[in-house]
From Swiss-Prot:
GO MF: peptidase activity; sodium:proton antiporter activity
Stated name of the protein: Na(+)/H(+) antiporter NhaA
Organism: Brucella abortus (strain 2308)
Region: Peptidase S49, residue numbers: 388-736
Signal peptide range in chain numbering: none
Primary location class: membrane
Family (UniProt): In the N-terminal section; belongs to the NhaA Na(+)/H(+) (TC 2.A.33) antiporter family. In the C-terminal section; belongs to the peptidase S49 family.
Gene3D superfamilies in the cross-refs: 2-enoyl-CoA Hydratase, Chain A, domain 1, 6.20.330.10, Na+/H+ antiporter like domain
Job of this protein: Na(+)/H(+) antiporter that extrudes sodium in exchange for external protons.
Region Na(+)/H(+) antiporter NhaA, residue ranges: 1-387
Upper classification of the organism: Bacteria, Pseudomonadati, Pseudomonadota, Alphaproteobacteria, Hyphomicrobiales
Swiss-Prot/TrEMBL keywords: Antiport, Cell inner membrane, Cell membrane, Ion transport, Membrane, Sodium, Sodium transport, Transmembrane, Transmembrane helix, Transport
Cellular component, GO annotation: plasma membrane
Length: 736
């Protein structure tokens, strides 16, 4: 049967793709991307339920991580043995540069992670997560550069990654072993001994080795040592020498098994692992997870620790004469490859799953690994694409002013930051959040200030940092993102966040409120005082335009109250306001029917004429609330209040007069006051409302719920207009 060239072409294209160096990395990236999409799609629940589906004694996720990945580690072990005995690592001179660089790439990321998490033993278990390099992913990115990257760099990266994997295997075997079962461990040693004896006796048939490897996996799995170690041990026992009478080394059991496993592992095993473990649901995740020390430790360990550890160790080895620089590679290209070593994906996620049983910590681990790996892949690729080969053996390490590749990389950073600022100005709220997050991240990677923070606090001079909370708006429930208001529901989160800063000696609260609901005012006041006592912090309140009525009640939570000379302060009283429509229904021909059980259930009905007894009852309630307000002022301002008879009459004053009456402690502004109190180097840190991982505002300052949908806006438009009118009326009492 004849085939046309057209019908044969798709097959040849697929074959070329599968044979390319980048194929494994591209497939893994696609699997990870697909997992993220599915985990945040309508099929998310099905995806997670499937992973927790039990097949025999284990869930599907455990079969993938404990059994399927043993095949991956079997291939890793085969590659390590072949390279050590008959490859790039067969001689000590060839081992020196990648070996020293790999050591630096394991040690420095672990140190960065440990420094950030030294005070949390549970998180510290993940110290090895950022120490691994994903060989398929890293080589896949490097191969995308084609001839731009010298072959010596590819050999260097492959060799370094193999040594990295060897270190990871040793770390897993030593540090991530559960409670040991000695009978099963003994059986595992006996099985390994059988494999060793078969090797020494010259057995070259693969089947006995594979059967023994499965038995070894079973015993190791039940011993408490992680089952994937069985794959490496079995690989080390498989003969590298060919069968007698077969001089071709490629006929050896090791070569045949390695060749048979290469494509299934690259295109089936590893992508399945990536798909099963890269799925992160962003629903309900807060942006604060990006600032968690666990996430940061992994992200910075991979992105900064790897590149500085690998490149620094390689530079020292080359400069001291212990090793030679890869032929034809420039220093910038070597640095680019060091950045690519921060692609940790497969092995990093695997170690993370061993380190943390908690779902939240595993999610933070995956976010850190994905973020650090993505940054390393993008920056490493861009730098290598801009770099040029070594022109001279005597080329100095860095000539920033003359190096074309450095200039190109600088241009890239400038364009990136300019684009992100444009996005922050013109894009939607969600894109603004993502853009500013990326911009801040790239700046922090570039600035030495972040590196300074990696040093333990007791070993560095730390500037005093004061959290600042801004409370702005009328005090009432029911606010939205379109009409922000103050209530306990809207302020509790941001207040908790401000007082949680254990290094801050105080919290500064900037208030600009004309008052509103007395209950919400007192609840906010009470929450501030409770947090101040709980965290043993001073509270400084700074008045902007106005702190009147309920706004002043909140201000009483401060140990000191500072206002501008022109601020409006006071209005210690109670006011109730509503509308009356006693004739409206009659004029429009509507009859209102009200049925009650209880003679006072229609008190202050706006559709009925005012009643004297209703007004009297309301006045009594107001007097009780007023008395509570007065007691609060006298308690918090004890020994400071003046004798003005109008102090509690509801009048309000400028900041200058309020200071003379003892309602505030002084005049000034926040920055000047705090600099005078804590020194010129004090820093103010504005506490922002929390956002979800994708930039959506979470319930917080100025609103009781999340974002408002168009249907909600339409449904509550009338109510919203009345509330806006009421709020405007409150501000208008003070000429604002």
């Amino acid at each position: 049967m004849n085939h046309s060239p057209q019908s044969a072409r798709p097959v040849s294209i697929m074959r070329r793709f599968l044979d390319s160096e980048a194929a494994g990395g591209i497939t893994l990236m696609a699997a990870a991307a697909l997992a993220l999409i599915v985990a945040n799609s309508p099929f998310a629940q099905t995806y997670f339920d499937a992973l927790h589906l039990y097949i025999g004694p284990l869930s599907l996720a455990h079969w993938i991580n404990d059994a399927l990945m043993a095949i991956f580690f079997l291939l890793v072990g085969l590659e390590i043995k072949r390279e050590m005995l008959d490859g790039q690592l067969a001689s000590w001179p060839n081992r020196m540069l990648p070996g020293i660089a790999a050591a630096g790439g394991v040690i420095l990321p672990a140190i960065i992670f440990a420094v950030l998490n030294h005070d949390n033993p549970a998180k510290l278990r993940g110290w090895a997560v950022p120490s691994a390099t994903d060989i398929a992913f890293a080589l896949g990115v490097l191969s995308l550069l084609g001839s731009r990257a010298p072959s010596s760099l590819k050999v260097f990266l492959a060799t370094l990654a193999i040594l990295d994997d060897l270190a990871a295997v040793v770390i897993i075997a030593i540090f991530y072993t559960a409670e040991i079962s000695m009978p099963y461990l003994g059986a595992a040693f006996i099985t390994a001994a059988v494999l060793f004896v078969m090797n020494r006796m010259g057995v070259v048939k693969l089947l006995p080795y594979l059967i023994s490897a499965v038995i070894l996996w079973f015993f190791v799995f039940n011993s408490g040592v992680h089952a994937t170690v069985a794959g490496v041990v079995a690989a080390l026992m498989i003969p590298l020498k060919p069968a007698p009478g077969r001089p071709d080394d490629m006929t050896s059991p090791l070569h045949k098994l390695e060749h048979a496993l290469a494509k299934p592992v690259a295109f089936i095993v590893v992508p399945i692992f990536g798909f099963a473990n890269a799925g992160i649901s962003f629903k309900g995740l807060e942006a604060s997870v990006l600032g968690d020390t666990l996430t940061l430790g992994i992200l910075l360990g991979l992105f900064l620790g790897k590149q500085f550890g690998v490149f620094g160790a390689a530079w020292l080895a080359i400069k001291t004469g212990l090793a030679e620089k890869p032929m034809g590679a420039s220093w910038v290209q070597l640095y680019g490859v060091a950045i690519l070593c921060g692609i940790g994906f497969t092995m990093s996620i695997f170690i993370g799953l061993l380190s943390f049983p908690s779902d939240l910590m595993q999610t933070e681990t995956k976010i850190g690994v994905l973020s650090g790996s993505a940054l390393s892949a993008i920056c490493g690729y861009l730098l290598l694409r801009a770099a040029r080969p070594d022109q001279s053996a005597a080329n100095p390490l860095w000539k920033a002013d003359e190096s074309p590749e450095a200039k190109n990389f600088g241009r890239f950073l400038c364009v990136f930051h300019f684009a992100s600022y444009i996005a922050s100005t013109y894009c939607t709220e969600r894109l603004q959040a993502a853009s500013s997050l990326l911009r801040r991240s790239s700046l922090e990677f570039a600035l030495p200030g972040l590196l300074k923070r990696l040093i333990p606090r007791r070993f560095r001079a730390v500037e005093t940092e004061i959290p600042v909370v801004r409370l702005h708006g009328a005090i009432m429930t029911g606010g939205t993102s379109l009409r922000p208001t103050l209530s306990l529901a809207s302020t509790a989160g941001i207040l908790e966040k401000a007082f949680a800063d254990k290094h801050a000696p105080a919290v500064a609260i900037s208030i600009n409120s004309p008052g509103g609901a007395p209950v919400q005012s007192r609840l906010i006041y009470r929450r501030i005082r409770d947090l101040a006592v709980e965290h043993q912090k001073k509270v400084f309140v700074f008045v902007e335009d106005v702190a009147a009525s309920g706004g002043y009640m909140i201000a009483l939570a401060g140990d000191e109250i500072i206002a501008d000379p022109s601020s409006i302060v006071g209005s210690i009283g109670v006011v109730s306001a509503s509308f009356g429509f006693p004739e409206l229904l009659k004029k429009i021909g509507v009859e209102r029917r009200v049925y009650t059980a209880g003679s006072n259930k229609v008190t202050l009905d706006p559709f009925q004429p005012e009643k004297a007894e209703d007004i009297e009852r309301l006045k009594a309630l107001q007097l009780e609330i007023h008395a509570t307000f007065i007691d609060m002022v006298k308690e918090r301002r004890a020994g400071k209040l003046g004798d003005n008879p109008d102090l509690f009459s509801g009048l309000f004053w400028t900041g200058t007069t309020a200071a003379s009456l003892g309602l505030i402690d002084g005049l000034g502004d926040m920055r000047s006051f705090l600099r005078k109190t804590y020194g010129d180097k004090v820093k103010l840190k504005l506490i922002q409302p929390q956002r979800g991982l994708l930039g959506r505002k979470l319930p917080g300052i100025g609103m009781d719920s999340g974002s408002v949908e168009p249907a909600q806006i339409a449904a509550h438009l009338g109510d919203g207009l009345l509330c806006v009118a009421e709020e405007k009326a409150i501000w208008a009492r003070y000429g604002l």
